[in-house]
Amino acid sequence: EKLKTIIKLPGTHVRGRGGVEYEWSPDNQWIAYTTRTGSSAFNIWIVPADGGKPVNVTRLNAFHSDPTWSVDGKYLYFQSDRDGEGLYRLALKPDAFRISDVDMKFVKPSKPVKVEIDFDGIHRRITKMSSQNPSSDLIAAADGRLYFLAHGDIYRVSYDGRETKKTTTGGRRVAFRVMNDGRRVTFMKGGEMYVGKIDGGPETKITFEADWIHDVNAERMAAFNEFWKTFNHRFYDANFHGRDWDALRIKYLKRMGSVDTPMEFSTLLQMMVGELEASHTEVTAPSDTPKPTTPHLGFTIDHSHRGLGLKVKTVPKGAPGSFEKTLIKSGEFIISIDGSMVDANERLYSLLNAREDRIVELLVNDKPQKSGARKVRYQLMSQTDWRDLTYQNQVTATRRAAETASKGKIGYLHIAAMSSSDQARFEREAYEYILGKDAMIFDVRNNRGGNISDTLIDWLERKPHGIYQSRDQSPEVAPDRAWNKRVIVLMNEHSYSNGEMFPYAMRQRGLAEKLVGIATPGYVIWTSGFSLPGGYKARIPGKAVYRMDGSNMENNGEKPDVRVWMTPDEWIAGKDPQLDKALELLQPKPTAQKP
């Protein structure tokens, strides 16, 4: 049968992974689909299956996804953040919208459904059904109810939207589906398949045995072809940075015969895509080898000491050894751990690996000998906790240095990354540290990137427009948390991705007087991930970031107004010439003297 193009959606690439979501109506006469509208909104459109004019049925600058038709053809369900995250219902005809939730009853269709849509004012017939935000596809069951996963558990929403109920507990469920009988569900949990009743209750693991031949070479060839095809369809630059992507496929296909291990295969893919000279293109090989977890002792070691014991160099504030009952001082020696004598060699880590409780007994002395030592018992830190503590102490020390040098007039705030948790932290700390300051230093050095720079810029563009004053109360600047004072941004060669977009935007919008530090690396592009046969993971750049002058930020990092290099010796000594320069530039400007 001849294929027919219903509608072309530039940039969505249905043939690749990701892109547009679409759903056929119960009578196969309509298609509901999502596509980007404007700069950031995703709206839902409906188009006749035989072609015709598509209609935007959500019409709001918000995120809409997962369109799902009701089995009776009266409603279209979807996820959105248009009025808070949750589940929404669109009535396809006005009479279905006017029915109150109390009177709304599901009647199972007795004959094939014919979907009728009145598009006049359809975007005004939207109702929020549940504030529970789904993390899976929506499933409209034969009984009229909706099912979905959230936080690894199954949720059920009644046809009228008056009841949202969690039918399972314990989480960890993925790949959820309702069976054809409408009474049972299947899902994956812990890598195994289960079946259970749709309304909860006992779950049965589905076990089976099967012989199969794992053709590793064929699997890798399939992964190679899919990797190449995905980049061919979805790489942001159709010109592939001036490279011949077809020729690169042939070049590296010839090398497939020399690949023996998963790591070698992922390396080959990285070499092929590396010729595009684009960032965010990592390929990760699967690993079935369990890696031991090594907790952190909670102090740094002075490696100049040779011989018995670990000489303690520093014990950071907040580490177990900084508290009175478990105090360990700088310069003391750890003679043994749980009775095993130690020194600063690789055997030390074998004593720490894979300890679930991480509780140890240390023998501590002020000299490298067992005689006269005391016992200290505490729980070791995880590597993540150690990194977080070290980071917090460094930020606190830098903030204190800025406030001390400026006599409390200049505030300091570090942005470690650009995730939602970093946004919440920024808003919390900005309110705390901006108050009473004449100027601020925003530091994105070593920022790992993310996606919130636009939100931060919006926040910093809030400007005062008035003052609110109550009787016997201090005046309040309106709007709340508005900032209209001096700013300098610190950045360096380890500010990545969205952490590079932030200083550019601060300068472009006139929010920062100066950018101080070292040019960023130009690791700037919007990316997404995809999977390959064999368990390989890859990332692909899908959207470029251009400055207002048209220059691409990819491989073209942001340059500072004032270049200040930090030498290794300065870093080791705890000096910060970049901060010093920012403080110098933010000193009050001298006023001109009248003759």
Predicted features along the sequence, with ranges:
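Terminal targeting/pro-maturation regions of precursor/exported proteins
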Residues: 202-276, 280-282, 304-306, 310, ...
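PDZ/PDZ-like domain segments forming the peptide/carboxylate-binding groove
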Residues: 292-345, 420, 543-544
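Extended, small/polar residue-biased N-terminal targeting/export presequences
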Residues: 255-308, 370-398, 578, 583, ...
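Multi-bladed beta-propeller domains
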Residues: 1-20, 35-36, 45-63, 91-111, ...
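Short glycine/acidic-enriched loop and turn motifs that connect beta-strands
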Residues: 37-40, 82-84, 153, 193
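Conserved beta-propeller blade repeats
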Residues: 8-34, 41, 55, 59-77, ...
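Blade-level signature of beta-propeller repeat domains, shared across WD40, Kelch, NHL, RCC1
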Residues: 70, 74-95, 186-206
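Cleft-lining beta-strand/loop regions that shape enzyme active-site pockets
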Residues: 234, 311-313, 318-320, 335-533, ...
